[in-house]
Amino acid sequence: SSFWTDSNNKTINDLIDFTHTFFAKHTLINVLTKYCVFTSERMLLVMRPYQIAATERIIGRINVSNNYKQYGKTEGGGYIWHTTGSGKTLTSFKTAQLASRLDYIDKVLFVVDRKDLDYQTMKEYNRFEEGAADSNTSTSVLQRQLENKDKNGGYHDYRIIITTIQKLSIFI
Protein backbone atom coordinates (compact mmCIF):
# COMPACT_ATOMS: atom_id res chain seq x y z
CA SER A 1 0.00 0.00 0.00
CA SER A 2 1.06 3.59 -0.49
CA PHE A 3 0.70 6.48 1.92
CA TRP A 4 0.37 10.13 0.99
CA THR A 5 3.47 12.11 1.91
CA ASP A 6 4.66 15.67 1.68
CA SER A 7 7.37 16.76 -0.77
CA ASN A 8 10.04 15.61 1.71
CA ASN A 9 8.50 12.11 1.75
CA LYS A 10 7.22 12.53 5.33
CA THR A 11 4.07 10.44 5.78
CA ILE A 12 0.88 12.39 6.40
CA ASN A 13 -0.97 10.27 8.97
CA ASP A 14 -3.58 12.77 10.08
CA LEU A 15 -6.73 12.52 7.94
CA ILE A 16 -7.40 16.27 8.18
CA ASP A 17 -3.84 17.09 7.05
CA PHE A 18 -4.26 14.62 4.20
CA THR A 19 -7.55 16.14 3.04
CA HIS A 20 -6.11 19.67 3.19
CA THR A 21 -3.22 18.53 1.01
CA PHE A 22 -4.79 16.04 -1.38
CA PHE A 23 -8.16 17.71 -1.87
CA ALA A 24 -6.73 21.17 -2.47
CA LYS A 25 -8.14 22.01 -5.89
CA HIS A 26 -4.78 22.45 -7.64
CA THR A 27 -3.37 19.23 -6.13
CA LEU A 28 -6.32 17.08 -7.14
CA ILE A 29 -6.47 18.53 -10.66
CA ASN A 30 -2.70 18.03 -11.12
CA VAL A 31 -2.82 14.44 -9.89
CA LEU A 32 -5.70 13.62 -12.24
CA THR A 33 -4.42 15.48 -15.32
CA LYS A 34 -0.63 15.28 -15.05
CA TYR A 35 0.41 12.52 -12.70
CA CYS A 36 -1.66 9.50 -13.72
CA VAL A 37 -0.93 7.04 -16.50
CA PHE A 38 -3.55 4.81 -18.07
CA THR A 39 -1.30 2.02 -19.34
CA SER A 40 -1.59 0.09 -22.58
CA GLU A 41 -2.90 -2.79 -20.42
CA ARG A 42 -5.74 -0.47 -19.33
CA MET A 43 -4.41 -0.14 -15.79
CA LEU A 44 -4.44 3.20 -13.96
CA LEU A 45 -1.13 4.15 -12.34
CA VAL A 46 -1.05 7.13 -9.99
CA MET A 47 2.38 8.51 -9.27
CA ARG A 48 3.55 8.41 -5.67
CA PRO A 49 4.00 11.76 -3.91
CA TYR A 50 7.82 11.64 -4.11
CA GLN A 51 7.58 10.89 -7.86
CA ILE A 52 5.29 13.89 -8.31
CA ALA A 53 7.68 16.07 -6.28
CA ALA A 54 10.65 14.86 -8.36
CA THR A 55 8.82 15.52 -11.63
CA GLU A 56 7.73 18.99 -10.51
CA ARG A 57 11.27 19.86 -9.43
CA ILE A 58 12.73 18.72 -12.75
CA ILE A 59 10.15 20.70 -14.73
CA GLY A 60 10.81 23.66 -12.42
CA ARG A 61 14.55 23.38 -13.06
CA ILE A 62 13.94 23.24 -16.82
CA ASN A 63 11.80 26.39 -16.60
CA VAL A 64 14.39 28.26 -14.49
CA SER A 65 17.20 27.16 -16.82
CA ASN A 66 15.23 28.44 -19.80
CA ASN A 67 14.18 31.71 -18.15
CA TYR A 68 17.72 32.52 -16.97
CA LYS A 69 19.49 31.06 -20.04
CA GLN A 70 21.56 28.59 -18.00
CA TYR A 71 22.01 26.11 -20.86
CA GLY A 72 25.14 23.98 -20.48
CA LYS A 73 25.92 25.38 -17.02
CA THR A 74 26.02 23.42 -13.78
CA GLU A 75 23.24 25.64 -12.40
CA GLY A 76 21.00 24.47 -15.23
CA GLY A 77 21.37 20.78 -14.44
CA GLY A 78 20.40 18.41 -11.71
CA TYR A 79 19.55 14.84 -10.89
CA ILE A 80 16.91 12.82 -9.12
CA TRP A 81 17.97 9.99 -6.87
CA HIS A 82 15.49 7.12 -6.47
CA THR A 83 16.23 3.70 -5.01
CA THR A 84 15.72 0.36 -6.76
CA GLY A 85 12.05 -0.37 -7.37
CA SER A 86 10.92 3.15 -6.55
CA GLY A 87 9.48 4.01 -9.95
CA LYS A 88 12.33 5.83 -11.69
CA THR A 89 11.06 4.84 -15.12
CA LEU A 90 7.55 6.16 -14.47
CA THR A 91 9.03 9.37 -13.06
CA SER A 92 11.25 9.79 -16.13
CA PHE A 93 8.36 8.99 -18.48
CA LYS A 94 6.01 11.59 -17.00
CA THR A 95 8.84 14.13 -16.77
CA ALA A 96 9.77 13.57 -20.43
CA GLN A 97 6.12 13.74 -21.46
CA LEU A 98 5.46 16.98 -19.56
CA ALA A 99 8.76 18.55 -20.70
CA SER A 100 8.00 17.70 -24.33
CA ARG A 101 4.81 19.75 -24.04
CA LEU A 102 6.63 22.94 -23.03
CA ASP A 103 6.51 25.50 -25.84
CA TYR A 104 10.27 26.07 -25.90
CA ILE A 105 11.26 22.37 -25.89
CA ASP A 106 11.77 20.79 -29.31
CA LYS A 107 12.91 17.36 -28.15
CA VAL A 108 13.51 15.40 -25.00
CA LEU A 109 16.47 13.02 -25.09
CA PHE A 110 16.45 10.28 -22.48
CA VAL A 111 20.02 9.01 -22.39
CA VAL A 112 20.91 5.68 -20.79
CA ASP A 113 24.34 4.17 -20.25
CA ARG A 114 23.68 0.60 -21.38
CA LYS A 115 22.00 -1.06 -24.35
CA ASP A 116 19.86 -3.26 -22.08
CA LEU A 117 18.52 -0.12 -20.35
CA ASP A 118 17.74 1.34 -23.78
CA TYR A 119 15.51 -1.65 -24.57
CA GLN A 120 14.04 -1.88 -21.06
CA THR A 121 13.18 1.84 -20.95
CA MET A 122 11.53 1.76 -24.37
CA LYS A 123 9.52 -1.32 -23.38
CA GLU A 124 8.29 0.40 -20.20
CA TYR A 125 7.53 3.69 -21.97
CA ASN A 126 5.43 1.73 -24.49
CA ARG A 127 3.64 0.05 -21.60
CA PHE A 128 2.85 3.49 -20.17
CA GLU A 129 1.76 4.86 -23.56
CA GLU A 130 2.23 3.08 -26.87
CA GLY A 131 4.22 5.25 -29.30
CA ALA A 132 4.97 8.04 -26.81
CA ALA A 133 8.72 7.75 -27.39
CA ASP A 134 11.08 6.56 -30.08
CA SER A 135 14.27 4.53 -29.75
CA ASN A 136 17.02 3.92 -32.27
CA THR A 137 19.25 1.07 -33.36
CA SER A 138 22.15 3.13 -34.70
CA THR A 139 23.72 6.56 -34.76
CA SER A 140 22.32 7.19 -38.24
CA VAL A 141 18.78 6.50 -36.98
CA LEU A 142 19.42 8.86 -34.05
CA GLN A 143 20.58 11.55 -36.49
CA ARG A 144 17.44 11.09 -38.59
CA GLN A 145 15.27 11.39 -35.47
CA LEU A 146 17.05 14.57 -34.39
CA GLU A 147 16.43 15.99 -37.88
CA ASN A 148 12.72 14.98 -37.75
CA LYS A 149 12.99 12.69 -40.76
CA ASP A 150 11.31 9.31 -41.11
CA LYS A 151 13.13 6.41 -42.78
CA ASN A 152 11.91 7.59 -46.21
CA GLY A 153 13.16 11.15 -45.67
CA GLY A 154 9.71 12.61 -44.96
CA TYR A 155 8.87 14.76 -41.96
CA HIS A 156 8.19 13.09 -38.61
CA ASP A 157 8.10 14.94 -35.28
CA TYR A 158 10.18 12.93 -32.82
CA ARG A 159 9.41 14.53 -29.42
CA ILE A 160 10.86 11.99 -26.96
CA ILE A 161 13.92 9.99 -28.02
CA ILE A 162 15.51 7.22 -25.95
CA THR A 163 19.13 6.52 -26.82
CA THR A 164 22.42 5.37 -25.35
CA ILE A 165 25.30 7.61 -24.33
CA GLN A 166 27.45 5.68 -26.81
CA LYS A 167 25.23 6.53 -29.82
CA LEU A 168 24.95 10.14 -28.72
CA SER A 169 28.73 10.39 -28.25
CA ILE A 170 29.38 9.01 -31.75
CA PHE A 171 26.81 11.42 -33.20
CA ILE A 172 28.35 14.45 -31.50
Task: Tell me what each language-model feature is.
Residues 106-109, 172:
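Short beta-alpha connecting loops at secondary-structure transitions
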Residues 112:
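Short beta-strand/turn micro-motifs composed of small residues
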Residues 1-107, 116, 120-131, 156-160, ...:
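ATP-dependent helicase/translocase motor core
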